[in-house]
Amino acid sequence: MLQKPRGTQDFFLDEAKLWNKVETKLKEILDQFNYSEIRTPMFESKELFIRSIGSTTDIVSKEMYEFVDKKNRSLVLKPEGTASVVRAVIENKLYAEENLPLKVYYISPMFRYERPQNGRYRQFHQLGIEVFGSDSIQQDYEVLNIATKIINQFKLNKNIKIYTNFLITGKNREDYILELKKYLSDFKLCNDCNTRLEKNPLRVLDCKIDDKQFKNVPSMQDFLTKEQKTRYDQTLELFKKTNISVIHDDKLVRGLDYYTGFIFEIKYLNNNNEQTIIAGGRYNNLVNEIGNINLAACGFGMGLERFINIIKEQNSSLVNQKTNIDLYTICIDDLAIELNQQILDLTRSIGLKADSNYYHLSLKSALKKADKLNPKYVIILGSNEAKTNEFIIKDQINKTQIKTTLTKFIKDLK
């Protein structure tokens, strides 16, 4: 029997409904902040991700799904969303002054060839938000504020921690890297980190194998310029004044090379294991690196698989919330098919949800089916109802019933 590829999932019935509810709620939150949706292709040129994410990252060096098309062009399935959005902004000239600040979001499948495990898949879904054209501290605040609002709106406050850092740039970055290299030279590093040490030493701090041994990492804070330090302090003060509790982490660098300035990760503590659920920050140089356009930018990404797993653990009310329909009709005789269809069409015409048993079931089985759908009203139609155009509407909430006619039913609906 043919089966789905390893690291992928099928979504159906209650699981698909839960995903739909989560995505709808996320879009409602982003609409409150005036973000609009953007959709980009499922695959892009390989060069886009090499230039944006960085050639030394695990994503580019190990995890991309690559293929060559019939014109010998190197393409990849999207491993993340930001680079695609930046490409779209440049190609479609969305950086025009009248569009700024440009605030967009996407919910899209991504693809990475990594070992499948709990909450991590080779095809996964990501919510991302991106803001272009604003270098304001208030914009950094808004991005993290949206992330915390998502956590709060889904009632996931338990075991949540927010970590922040400020990545230095320019000459000070070079000085810090020299100090970091000196510090790391005393450790026995994994093979990947030995490569990173030469190409991008900051990435060593993001290693899942070696990071536990780095206890006294040189602090980036000691190398920030006065301007950078002031900006970071003002950002943290804004969080403090609005009761957003954050923890500074010198080892936080993010797994993508394009980040500069303020960065953050929101982590969930699960059985003494911290899982990142939302992460992002500022990447002011990325648009310039891809399209030679100076445009400030910031944003975040959130893996929906892991997020929904946490919802299942903490928010049972959303998981167990039944999707009600307004009317369920049970047609037990072919003579009542026309009447049944008239009732359904009229109900749906005014925006109500209605369904029926379109195949022959015993009355007992049909009533069981109705119970699963949790309708407000149930109508049973047989040959007598078809002849008289009279039928009984059962109110499932108030446990009452009334007899009515098709004419009166139409009038009551209107």
Swiss-Prot record:
Group of enzyme by EC: ligase
Regions annotated as coiled coil: none
InterPro entries, per the entry: aa-tRNA-synth_II (IPR006195), aa-tRNA-synth_II/BPL/LPL (IPR045864), Anticodon-bd_dom_sf (IPR036621), His-tRNA-ligase (IPR015807), HisRS-like_core (IPR041715), HisRS/HisZ (IPR004516)
Alphabetized UniProt keyword annotations: Aminoacyl-tRNA synthetase, ATP-binding, Cytoplasm, Ligase, Nucleotide-binding, Protein biosynthesis
One matching Pfam family: tRNA-synt_His
Sequence similarity: Belongs to the class-II aminoacyl-tRNA synthetase family.
Assembly and binders: Homodimer.
Protein name listed in UniProt: Histidine--tRNA ligase
